[in-house]
A protein has these predicted regions:
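Intrinsic-disorder/low-complexity, polar/charged segments
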Residues: 12-15, 19, 94-102, 169-173
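Amphipathic alpha-helical
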Residues: 98-164
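Amphipathic alpha-helical/coiled-coil segments positioned at domain termini
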Residues: 54-59, 137-200
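Short hydrophobic/aromatic segments of transmembrane alpha-helices and their interfaces
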Residues: 27, 49, 139-141
Length: 201
């Protein structure tokens, strides 16, 4: 059963320490039920998952969005075949059930990354090659029924941001926390990857 935990809101941006504090605030019974973490690859979340030995499933949407941001139209136009090739290899790596069948694709992608002229794109590809297993844990642990994206959470956050903007801000973090809690209770559920519903507890 999936659940939405009551919100924890702190000042400042997203940080490693902030995520550590957020997870430390969870009760031990809840922490003990967590087996995996689906995230966008933020260092703080990766650190938390490693420290707590949780399975880490990285978001496919953020991966391809990152590639698009770093693969400019000019670069794509000049290296069309190469761009299509690494895109195809990545999709094969993150969707093929058999690990043995993708080893050659991982090796090919590693070689392609060495010759990429764009530093930013090369960095993303090398990062993917190092951590490709994190994008496949939904296949490795099918019994957990892990989503491959964080889209449901991103959508919920967007809804909260939209109504916060309409409210024109809050005087204190406490009042904001109360408002977000009420918003989540009113929403009642959120669809996760099209299969599971969650309830606020």
């Amino acid at each position: 059963q999936a659940i939405i935990l009551r919100p924890y809101i702190c000042q400042g941006g997203e940080t490693c320490l902030g995520w550590q504090v957020a997870f430390n605030r969870l009760s031990k019974p809840i922490q003990q039920t967590i087996a995996a973490l689906v995230c966008d690859g933020h260092r703080g979340l990766i650190s938390v998952s490693k420290k707590r030995r949780w399975i880490l499933q990285r978001c496919h949407f953020h991966l391809f969005a990152s590639l698009q941001r770093r693969c400019s139209m000019r670069y794509f136009g000049q290296h069309r075949q190469e761009s299509k090739l690494f895109d195809s290899l990545i999709r094969e790596i993150v969707t093929t059930p058999s690990t043995k069948e993708i080893l050659s694709s991982v090796s090919n992608l590693k070689e392609i990354a060495k010759n990429i002229s764009s530093y930013r794109l090369r960095s993303v590809l090398r990062g993917f090659v190092r951590n490709y297993k994190d994008y496949r844990h939904y296949l490795t642990y099918p019994h957990l029924k892990l989503p491959t994206t964080t889209n449901s959470a991103e959508s919920l956050i967007s809804s909260i941001s939209y109504f916060c903007n309409r409210a024109r801000g809050f005087r204190t973090i406490n009042s904001l926390t109360k408002w977000v809690t009420a918003f989540l209770k009113n929403k009642k559920s959120v669809t996760c990857n099209g299969y599971f519903s969650t309830k606020l507890v």
